[in-house]
């Protein structure tokens, strides 16, 4: 089965479980074609088809509740029940009992691709070593939350914008096509509310 067949099969399956917007799939296909990293992000179904044959030893590792579609952009921050800023994995839509190696190999592959495409300034082998070291240390330490206010001042600075420039994000956001214009009544209400906030 080639990638086109695998994608059609996956999207047919998906349409049987959720409402699929055809134009969104077209956009997804365009993004997938832009580079290898975006392709990896969008094709977990294909990864699962090929991984057992390409990495048979890793595929026979013990099973855990894995993230599945793990890659370097599936990390972020949120507030926990106590209001603390926590950093970690933030995408669980494809979590499933799988060999634990799936997450490690996929995360390492994504880091390697991100480096190759200039998205990360690391030596690929160092990125892979850091992933393995972090995973091992996390197991040894009991998997405590990564609370930024406690032991991670540099990461906290990055995610609280002191070292991060949001300009690129907003430029990309503004470049997205308008799917449906905001109704005039809603726009008027927003402008009135914004005006009140500045008084």
Q: Could you tell me what each predicted segment is?
A:
Residues 70-77:
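Hydrophobic residue at the +6 position relative to the catalytic HRD Asp in the kinase catalytic loop
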Residues 69, 91-93, 103:
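Acidic active-site catalytic centers that drive phospho-/nucleotidyl reactions
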Residues 1-65, 80-90, 96-98, 112-198:
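Regulatory N- and C-terminal appendages and interdomain linkers associated
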Residues 101-110:
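Catalytic or ion-translocation cores adjacent to nucleophile or general acid/base/metal-coordination motifs
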């Amino acid at each position: 089965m080639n990638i086109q067949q695998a994608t059609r099969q996956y999207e047919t399956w998906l349409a049987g479980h959720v409402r699929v917007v055809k134009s969104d799939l077209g956009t997804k296909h365009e993004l997938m074609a832009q580079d290898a990293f975006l392709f990896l992000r969008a094709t977990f179904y294909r990864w699962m088809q090929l991984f057992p044959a390409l990495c048979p030893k890793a595929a026979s590792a013990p099973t855990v509740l894995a993230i599945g579609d793990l890659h370097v952009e599936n990390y972020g921050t949120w507030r926990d029940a106590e209001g603390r800023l926590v950093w970690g994995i933030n995408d669980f839509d494809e979590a499933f009992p799988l060999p634990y190696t799936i997450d490690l190999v996929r995360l390492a592959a994504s880091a390697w691709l991100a480096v190759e495409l200039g998205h990360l300034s690391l030596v690929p082998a160092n990125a892979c070593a850091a992933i393995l070291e972090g995973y091992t240390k996390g197991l040894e330490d009991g998997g405590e939350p990564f609370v930024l206010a406690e032991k991670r001042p540099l990461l906290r600075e990055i995610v609280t914008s002191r070292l991060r420039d949001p300009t690129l994000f907003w430029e990309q956001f503004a470049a997205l096509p308008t799917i449906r214009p905001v109704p005039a009544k809603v726009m008027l209400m927003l402008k009135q509310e914004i005006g009140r906030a500045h008084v």
